Amino acid sequence: HGYTYCYFRQKGEKEIKLCGSKSERQGFTIFAVDMKDDKFIIRKDVEGLALSAGQEYEIFDIAIIKGDMDDVMDKYFFDFVGCKKPAIEHLSGYTSWYNYFQNINEEIIIRDLNGLDRASEEVNIFQVDDGYQAAGGDWLVTDHKKFPKGMKYIADEIHKKGYKAGIWLAPFSAQVSSMIAKKHPDWLLRHNRNGKKMLGCQGWGGAYTIDIYIPEVREYIKKVFNEVLNVWGFDMVKLDFLYSQCIEPRNGKTRGEIMCDGVDFLREVCGDKWILGCGVPLGTCMGIFDACRISCDVNKNWKFELK
């Protein structure tokens, strides 16, 4: 099974047949193949949807396109979904995550920035990942023991090298121990079933999710991005754990509609700055984000073995 779109190719043939949803706003689209009963099944996740009496609501808008792989993909993404030509033609560079995870500081970042001069590949971005902030959710409170000169200094040093400056955030997350979670418990999402605070991710020992439909939350997120992009001067944001916003449906909206609302809001507050999505359903950000991480963490060993 899969989500948003899928394609088939008969053995020995070059042509493919693609089935894809135009939008996930109505609800996430699930494609499944039942090999036992020889069935191809298309479902929409509309749990939580509330309609008024007599209201019409389009559930499915599906394209079926057959032909050469490149032509089919162009017709689906550009003509049907409405994606525009990517703003980024080539994105290659450095991220602190895979070498250090959260164990970064100013000395490490500046050392690696200077060391990138020796890279043989074309590099156009240098991205600082998790570990600069005092707590997840308190994005404007830098850990000054690790980064005594602050994050504007880091962005400035990256620009001096001629690279775009990138930084990681999880804008919908609030670490359990963060000031935001303690000061604004009314901002936190709660389970529909029992009203308990919802953990949106397990990072930092657990993090809650702040509700984007609360006006004060939206203002806080706008303030964060204004500081990061316009004061600190970063050019790209890597936005993580975005799925946490749509774990459960609410307010009469499906999970898909909630995620689309969240993605649209992030594009609004980021303007024309680059967005690299991470931990986000891909169908909701096609044509809106500039790029997406599509894999798990890269490591030199397997932490979990199937036995």
Provide a role label for each language-model segment:
Residues 122-307:
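Aromatic- and carboxylate-enriched substrate-binding clefts and catalytic-loop regions
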